[in-house]
């Protein structure tokens, strides 16, 4: 099953920016298109690098914020965004060709711990992008006989609805996570994703405030203000295939996992991709005819 034949992926990508761009250009492209990876290309469209949402959040509120925004620009976020070249954030991404098969895509994602791969032609020109969300969507409506609690992430970092945007970005950067459930007591009040953060910061009115020097007005914003609502949750004994179907239906990458209605963890597209194949008794099959992935427990 070649990448070019898959009923998933984005061809061409929603956002591609020149490798000579500023960090501000990538923030706007990523935030307003609500994507987590932006390929960088030269004037011929040849892949020259990639910037991830984690890189940007680290620049806005993590280690790079301290090393660059505060140390070099005296805390002026807008000036740092406008004057720092994207070369500072880029990484050299693994990629796949249009002729690559799905198994190669999955193995590369799992082996390198990455969530998206640029798809290139024989001349290394970017023609598309395939993400872990695209891949696991092929598992939708498949009964796996594996419960969500068997693959979920139990050690979840929770924040309060009134914690600030800056605190959220700091935690995302330091803990290398993309989602923060907001909990008051034991009640789930919302969830903030890395896409929510970048979508908010890239808004014209928010950038205008940063340009004016009103960083605190932006960075002190309560997380609940930018959070995704309502929060979708599943009980921990639900089949993984049903959880994937819910993610696909609502266009999201994670579900809060509950037990008797109380939050107990989170299951993400990354959990499905990397942990499901490791569950004892589970086999993964690729159906070339229907271009579908079948995964499930075949021995108990």
Swiss-Prot record:
Top-rank taxon: Archaea
InterPro entries: CBS_dom (IPR000644), CBS_dom_sf (IPR046342), Diverse_CBS-Domain (IPR051257)
Tagged with keyword Repeat: yes
Keywords, in A-Z order: CBS domain, Repeat
Sequence ranges assigned to domain CBS in this UniProt record: 10-68, 88-148, 152-207, 226-284
Pfam families given in the database record: CBS
CDD domains: CBS_arch_repeat1, CBS_arch_repeat2
Gene3D superfamilies xref list: CBS-domain
Protein name (Swiss-Prot/TrEMBL): Uncharacterized 33.4 kDa protein in ribosomal RNA operon
Protein species of origin: Thermofilum pendens
